[in-house]
Amino acid sequence: MTTLNLDGRRRAAVWRALEERRFDLLVIGGGITGAGIARDAALRGLSVALVEARDYASGTSSRSSKMIHGGLRYLSQGDIALVKEAASERQILRRIAPHLARIMPFLIPVPSLASLAKLRAGLWSFEKLGGVPESERHEVLNVAQFAAREPLMRVEGSNGAVAYPEFLTDDARLVLANIRSAQAAGAVVLNYAEARALLFEEGRTAGALVRSTLTGETNEVRIRARLVVNAAGPWLDAVRALERDGAEPRLSLSRGIHLVFARARLPIENTLILRAEDKRSIFVVPRGDFTYVGTTDTFYPSSDYWPKITQDDVAYLLRAVERWLKTPKLVDGDIVALWAGVRPLIAEPGKKANEVSRKDEIWTAPSGLVSIGGGKLSAYRAMAARVVDLVVERLEATARACATAEAPLPGAEGLEAARSALSHLGAQGERLIGLYGGEASSVVADGGDVAVEARRAVTSEGAVRLEDYWVRRSARAWFDVRAGLDSLVPAAAAMGALLGWDAQRQADEVAHCTQLEKQCRSALRPDAREMGHG
């Protein structure tokens, strides 16, 4: 199936393809790590299958702070190698997917000359480690310059700020780009396909029993593979338990939440890195007509797809914004949308969540099952390369060299032409470029409305539920007026026409998304749960 089009109508054919042959590699997990591994392995010439229990990027990989950053704060934790890798990987992503690496000035207030000296020393190291070009190195702003650059900031008592460029992304679209690229290179990929058991031959992992989790599908297949990689993110330990019941957990889960406001309510021009009351750094990030704030970092007991958000989480972020920004007091009713995600960190007993390293780690079980946990969105490509290097070694395979640092991701080609063609559309054009890159021109040519996006989500991007489009293909759940609720009915109609949904199924899909939105807003004060959508 060497095509970029992930057609949600062709699932029956994909199910058949999964059991027709023995693959070199089966990847369990369709987040950024699994998607990166599948793409790398397929580009090297291995036969690859990937299954995801829900939708691609439905876990951690759609709930991040949506940044490709070098991890400056990890220098203070001594993670030099992590910073070097993440800083270098930023430049690679900028090259292979420029539409998914939007450069943005980050401003960090400095309270004293001593803190300025310390910060600059860290930035010099960061820039050297990451090969940052001269034109993109940091600059120091005095108080007057700081106030002029970001008028909403409270600059009293500060010694100015440091400005340096980092990159923003759309995390779910980055996953999807890797999935589509993997399929174009020959991988067989499928969402809503859960690994329920592992297969063994002579004590070695030899595949998985996979069952559909999609309403109306009853498919169950045995996928045979010479090697299995567990890249299930927060569900990594659950997959490891399929190999050996009672296996010692490797992960420590941490929850992070984000709040979204109308840009008119929080009209900043730069990404701001602010100190919260507990000395943690939080981000305030402009994105189109919206501004989002995050994140928290607290241990969380379970690997939920939709983690519970608490009133304490919300209040913590609101207090940080109020402390630093000269804006009328933000209240729950100002919140347009909010999301929470769970980070799959490597367990380090005795440490607070924000102290746990973001390094990745690879384990190989006695049966040969390879598991990878931890890591950062910024370094996904390098993480994948390490895993595939190990796979090639274990299989003693003849494989091509890693090509993921050079091969462009879908949407990279034709980007400047599309940007020029869509420039007259203003913010809407920028939104489409951020989602589709060079492919945005065809979206506009087809009409560019919700129905066009929703149809494309089905025919080219593997969407088979309304949630897939609303949350992960379009980001309307986070970055749209009224949390994108007004898009649900027309999107359901467009998807339903392709997927054979009757009126009741369309209504059920809309109700499901509406319930998810209410679940997220349940953390707000009762009088604000139906507000904030203006």
Predicted regions and their residues:
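C-terminal accessory subdomains/tails of enzymes that are appended
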Residues: 13-17, 54, 100, 112-122, ...
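A conserved short coil-to-beta-strand element within the FAD-binding core of flavoproteins
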Residues: 191-206
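Dinucleotide-binding Rossmann-like beta1-alpha1 core, especially the glycine-rich loop
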Residues: 66-149, 282, 417, 427
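Beta1/beta-strand and adjacent pyrophosphate-binding region of the FAD-binding site
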Residues: 19-33, 49
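Extreme N-terminal leader/targeting segments of oxidoreductases
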Residues: 1-25, 40-44
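Glycine-rich FAD pyrophosphate-binding loop
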Residues: 42-63
